[in-house]
């Protein structure tokens, strides 16, 4: 979202699209600032379905709150090898892009973080 310099992830299915508020931790947003971003992006006419509660695969509990009115997902958002495989979501849905997107929107998934042994 260019007006705020905010990354919004776009996950494309066959008919469904999931939009994710990416990197609130990397932008060092407070929860009120993250909520303001959600409202600003929606005022512009964009849809948001989820917020990233991880940063390079590490859990950021600050954003795992009902105050942010979005599904809370985790990704490793890997840009470098040490970040690969740290975080993901597991969805109970048919192996179909649109079914997976609908399940995420409905909150029918669990967030998983790799153990830090």
Model-derived features: where do they sit?
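Charged catalytic cores and adjacent phosphate/nucleic-acid-binding surfaces used
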Residues: 9, 27-117
